Amino acid sequence: MEKEVVLMKGNEAIAHAAIRCGCDGYFGYPITPQSEVIETLAELKPWETTGMQVVQAESELASIYMVYGAAGAGKRAMTSSSSPGVALMQEGITYMAGAEVPGVIVNVQRGGPGLGTIQPSQGDYNQATRGGGNGDYKVIVLAPSSVQEMADFVDLAFELAFKYRNPAMILSDGVIGQMMEKVVLPPFKPRRTDDEVVKECPWASTGKPKNRERVVITSLELKPEIMEQRNLALQEKYRKIQENEVRFEEQQMTDAEYAIVAFGSAARLSEKAIEVAREQGIKVGLFRPITLFPFPTTQIAELAKTKKGILVVEINAGQMVQDVRLAVNGAIPVEQFGRLGGIVPEPEEIVQALKDKLF
């Protein structure tokens, strides 16, 4: 069967992939620079073809709780927003993490803090990887650096979310969301039937069929001893995720004396910066974390054994650099370069930062 290749925006790829990967429901609210997700879904009308429901909620708060409710019934449910909207969703996300309910959240980041700007940013790294709500919890975080990965990561996010009964986030940004590239769309995957949901998700609140105890979805537990055990179980789950689900990519690292560590659109910019640097005789390669949680700590620690220094490039004031420094543990210099206010760094600026900070 011939592959279907189309030209589209990253946001549009999210919408097409959601329909094709068996998503049962999308609940969202428009906000720049991710509005094309819900706009595309409205145009495609998947409720008439696959049965996928698309709801424009009254707010981001309502959106995440609709996801919580649908996912609590074992359905593949998702939402998308941009930075201020995802900030509003944090209460619902921590509820889902505490109740061990899977769901997918897409964050097409823009500049902040506060209302900030509609221009691109990577300023939500800490919020995504540390858990922006209350309590000790983690969200699985995937960081696409192309429109193709925007499409591919929707199904991957659902697979990981249901495998570990945990919210999963696709942490994109305004560059990837708005840029247009060729995409190979994934094949259609049928939505699960109600019987399949009952069989595959015994934890889900699907009513009370015969020979089954009732299921209550909640993050609340008033007995400290039981709550401690639930928290310890969560931490054990996060350890398993860290052990089994790390994903990363390396480019031109074989002969590299220096490394750039970057994710998302910053990694795309760094690819060009590496070309420029190598033309000037600087041997540098790229290490791109694809999962931000679980973070490739061990792999970066190994990387540090063979490099003279690392430059972390991110479109923020310096967030992922903290995790890189923890991984390197002082073995080699680790510096950071970024732009703020919605300004995207030029490749030449990255090369100059490499020279200024590590040479």
Regions found by a protein language model. Give the residues of each.
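N-terminal glycine-rich anion-binding loops that anchor highly charged ligand groups
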Residues: V6-E43
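Peripheral docking tails and interdomain loops at the edges
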Residues: E314-F359
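Glycine-/acidic-rich phosphate or pyrophosphate-binding loops and their flanking alpha/beta elements
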Residues: K9-A13, Q235-Y258, E271, E275
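Thiamine diphosphate
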Residues: E36-R130, I140-F162
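Conformationally flexible catalytic loops at phosphate/diphosphate-handling active centers
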Residues: R165-E250
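Generic long, charged, amphipathic alpha-helical segments
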Residues: S270-L303
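Structural signature of the thiamine diphosphate
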Residues: V139-D195, E349-F359
